[in-house]
């Protein structure tokens, strides 16, 4: 029960939830910038693959072995800066989004903040996974998280493309 680990989790959560420009709010502004009404976004029913993604991440993050939850978080956060960069490029090229607009802010924040988050989490996992068993559990968590993320994207393609 290492307080430094809990502090890192808390710091990550504070970064995402604090202030008027918290991550859920930035996502809503992105959706509005794409022409969606806030109320419509809030009332959207999740597709099967989205529900499975959320369920798997919740299961992993609530696991008593916190290296399992950290591994799932790392799987996600490790990809985000590059994904955000690609999203920004696509939104500019295909949708006419401009730097500094609310439409891009969600991705701009993740492009920079998650570079730090992923390194901190990677270092913590390296410290925490001090046995072969923990390393195997971490890898299994990453595999489930990655599979869930890929399935989520397949669901988006199935429904919206």
Regions picked out by a protein language model, each given a short descriptive name:
Residues 1-161:
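Non-heme di-metal
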């Amino acid at each position: 029960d290492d307080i430094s680990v809990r502090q890192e989790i808390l710091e990550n959560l504070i970064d995402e939830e604090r202030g008027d420009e918290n991550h859920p709010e930035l996502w809503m502004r992105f959706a509005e910038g794409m022409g969606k009404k806030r109320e419509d976004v809030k009332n959207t029913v999740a597709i099967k693959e989205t529900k499975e993604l959320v369920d798997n991440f919740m299961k992993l993050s609530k696991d008593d072995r916190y290296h399992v939850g950290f591994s799932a978080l790392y799987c996600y956060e490790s990809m985000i800066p590059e994904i955000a960069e690609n999203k920004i490029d696509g939104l500019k090229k295909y949708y006419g989004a401009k730097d500094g607009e609310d439409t891009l802010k969600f991705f701009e924040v993740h492009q920079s903040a998650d570079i730090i988050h992923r390194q901190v989490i990677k270092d913590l996992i390296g410290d925490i996974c001090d046995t072969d068993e923990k390393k195997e559990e971490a890898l299994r968590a990453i595999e489930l998280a990655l599979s869930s993320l890929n399935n989520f994207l397949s669901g988006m393609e199935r429904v919206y493309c």
